[in-house]
Amino acid sequence: MQDRKPQQIARELALLSLSQLPLNPKKLTEEHLPKLVLATVRTLRAEVQDTLDNAAAELQRSNDRLLTSQTRASDLNTARNMLQEAISHTQTAINQLGASVEFPELIQLANQDKEVGRYAIKLVKIINEERGMIDEQITSALVDWQVTRLAQIDRDILRIAVAEMMFLNLPNSVAINEAVELAKRYSGDEGHRFINGVLRRVSDQKKALSV
C-alpha cells in the first residue's frame, strides 16, 4: 500500500464508492468518502460470505456426485464442472477478502492525503454526470453484450478507465493498465482479461476517430 501513488488509491476509493452514492451525487464532497467506503465494506463482507457459501455448496454437490456415480462419464464430467465452478467461487471470495484487509488503510489515506480524496471525488462525479456518454463508449466496444448485463464491479472498473481516457486526458495505455490491476484485485478470475480486451477496443476506436 505504501508504494502506491495517490491516484491509484483514489481509483480504488472511487470504485468502492460508486455503488454507494447519495441520491444527489452533485453534493458529494471529500467528507463523504469514508462513509461511502465503510458502507461498501459492509456490502462486500456480505458478498464474500455469500460467495464462500456458494463455493461450499458447489464443493459438496460435486463431492456427492463423485461418491454416488458409478464412474459414468456424464456424472464424472458434471462433477468436474461443479468442482471447477466451486473453485472459481472460492477464488473470487479470496480475492475480495485479500482486498478488504486494506480497507481501513484506504479510509485513513483518504483522510490524510487531500489529493487522494479530490481525485476520487472527481472520478465519481464525472462518471455520474457523463454516464450516458461513457456507457455508450463501452457498449460500442462490447461484442454481443450490454453494459447493463455486466457484473457491477466490472462495469464500474470500465467506467473509471473510460472516464479517465475521455475526460481526464490520461493516456489510454495507463488507464488500461490501472483498470487491469483493479480487476485483478476485485473482479473474478477472468475479469482482468475481459476488461483488458474491452478497453483495448475502446482505445482503438478512439485512435481511429482521431485520424
Swiss-Prot record:
Question: Which Pfam families does the entry mention?
Answer: NusB
Q: Which InterPro entries match?
A: NusB-like_sf, NusB_fam, NusB_RsmB_TIM44
Q: Which GO terms describe its biological process?
A: DNA-templated transcription termination; transcription antitermination
The family database entries (Gene3D superfamilies) matched by this protein are listed as: NusB-like (1.10.940.10)
Kindly state which keywords UniProt assigns to this record, in alphabetical order: RNA-binding, Transcription, Transcription antitermination, Transcription regulation
Superkingdom as given in the UniProt entry: Bacteria
Span of the secretion signal? Answer: none
Name the Gene Ontology molecular function terms of this record.
RNA binding
- Which family would the database say this protein is a member of? Belongs to the NusB family.
Protein role = Involved in transcription antitermination. Required for transcription of ribosomal RNA (rRNA) genes. Binds specifically to the boxA antiterminator sequence of the ribosomal RNA (rrn) operons.
Give the protein's recorded name.
Transcription antitermination protein NusB
